[in-house]
Amino acid sequence: MIDTIKVNNKTIPWLYVERGFEIPSFNYVLKTENVDGRSGSIYKGRRLESYSFDIPLVVRNDYLSHNGIKTHDDVLNELVKFFNYEEQVKLQFKSKDWYWNAYFEGPIKLHKEFTIPVKFTIKVVLTDPYKYSVTGNKNTAISDQVSVVNSGTADTPLIVEARAIKSSSYFMITKNDEDYFMVGDDEVTKEVKDYIPPVYHSEFRDFKGWTKMITEDIPSNDLGGKVGGDFVISNLGEGYKATNFPDAKGWVGAGTKRGLPKAMTDFQITYKCIVEQKGKGAGRTAQHIYDSDGKLLASIGYENKYHDRKIGHIVVTLYNQKGDPKKIYDYQNKPIMYNLDRIVVYMRLRRVGNKFSIKTWKFDHIKDPDRRKPIDMDEKEWIDGGKFYQRPASIIAIYSAKYKGYKWMEMNGLGSFNTEILPKPKGARDVIIQKGDLVKIDMQAKSVVINEEPMLSEKSFGSNYFNVDSGYSELIIQPENVFDTTVKWQDRYL
């Protein structure tokens, strides 16, 4: 049987695996110790190690093959494109229903004078020595219990997704009364008090309650500009995209505004946006916060101000009663972000008394569309020593813009989450999970997010990420009758 390989589900039609290749498996290495005066050695244990091997490949290069006769450079260039990855890839034999997470190592050696057929080898490096089933599994909890059947020959990690049908101070999942993972606080002697109620939380799927900004420009050098453009629903119905940009100089864009249901003295405001940075260009998008008099109080947003470079940054600026700006946060993307084509950016501004806290994080939307693995995270605190920025937050606006005369790096708002912070009752437990929140736990990536916010800091001391063994396992969810929970896993093999 002629077989070929798939790399991230891609194949080359004229590339085949040479017959006779032996698939390596079960790479256990024993640890032993010699003892003087004793025959043999003492068994100290075993471990599953990483390993590498060569896959012999054949290039079909005749008139009947795909694209006919190919030159040395034609083949080499296609092979380089096929194998050139810095990160792990899914490596699968087309005839098998499992794959490795693999790296490739050079060199690729092709004979200068092509023969029929052309043979070469590619070195595969497995830092993760397991095989994974191509088909995933999932099961839904019934009465806060969920069964997991791992049909593989090795233990395997889980992905847990739990939607809160009530607010809660914690979420916990246990395995066979052996292992458990918990985020939050379940101390029964503390009363549960929800002192952080949502005031206005919205994903941008419609314009209900919003008013287009026509003449009221946004006086922010960092994140403002000329208004008058329009927003349309974009990103598969989940975002505000600016269109019909006004004819003016400088930053031009679209803005929309609304009042909050109530003014907030202490608050937590999160703005999320998506940035299309596959191509170069300048752009900015922000949420602006106003006081009850309609004066600008704060701006939180993302900007790429270079038309020929992909160097975005997150900016937070405060404004006093006179409108004078005070930039308290300016965080430039780490270099790992520059090569990503599409990113989702979260910015959170929290004010309690005279202390401002900023938390930002991002997701690679191409490789992590479910947003389980936050990257480029940062936090900072700033004290308003003179108490110049204490006015209540009453109105919010969303603004997206490009710079006139230059290519636009498209940036679209995805959502705005505005929460009031009331005085914390003495001895109360924090309600870290609100009704409707989605808790996501990735046991392999060792990440936990609540409503796409990284919450590893809330992981309970003593709990840990765990795998389920080969065969049957029973998982229990706590607290009872609070979460709709689904567990996902892949069978894993030695």
Which positions does each model-derived feature cover?
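Flexible glycan-contacting loops in extracellular carbohydrate-active proteins
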Residues: 369-412, 467
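Extracellular/lumenal carbohydrate-interaction signature centered on repeated Trp-anchored short motifs
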Residues: 257-269, 336-343, 466-468
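Extracellular carbohydrate-recognition regions
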Residues: 151-153, 178-235, 408-411, 420
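Secretory/extracellular carbohydrate-interaction modules
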Residues: 207-324, 412
